[in-house]
A protein has these predicted regions:
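His/Asp/Glu-rich mid-to-C-terminal helical/loop segments that flank catalytic regions of hydrolases
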Residues: 1, 105-138
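Metal-dependent peptidase/peptidase-like ectodomains
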Residues: 6-103
Length: 138
């Protein structure tokens, strides 16, 4: 199952609706994958990997490196630093893996294709995420 929500700009309205209508989906899900802001931005390659389970965070890091993302730019951080919708889900008891990038142009008119998109980075992230999902599915 996939669920897309609005971000902090709109107060996580989509997530709030999901919580209100389907709370068991939050806590009974095998895992929640939070694809946070700025994935694949060209200004900086910093990519934060955070999870409530450090084994899953390390697994994602390894997958990212295997798919060509530069290891020196991947920061594995504690689960308690998960932000955005992932933060909200974690505090409701969900198991969360979160990826978030960095971007000097965040919320600026200059934050667009092609100048501020790292296409190879996006491709590496997409392949790693697909592999992680396949591993979770068994």
């Amino acid at each position: 199952m996939a669920w897309a929500t609005s971000g902090h700009e709109l107060g996580h309205l989509g997530l709030q609706e999901l919580i209100h209508r389907h709370m068991p989906l939050i806590t009974n899900a095998h895992y929640w994958l939070h694809l946070g802001a700025n994935l694949g931005g060209a200004g900086t390659l910093t990519l934060r990997v955070r999870a409530v389970d450090t084994i899953e965070a390390q697994r994602m890091r390894d997958l990212l490196v295997a798919e060509g993302y530069p290891a020196q730019h991947i920061l594995v951080e504690p689960g308690n630093t998960i932000s955005g919708e992932g933060h909200d889900l974690m505090h409701l008891g969900a198991k969360v893996l979160s990826l978030a990038g960095s971007n000097r142009h965040f919320h600026a008119a200059s934050d667009r294709w092609p100048a501020n998109v790292n296409a190879p980075g996006v491709a590496s992230i997409a392949r790693a995420v697909a592999r992680w999902i396949a591993l979770q599915a068994g």
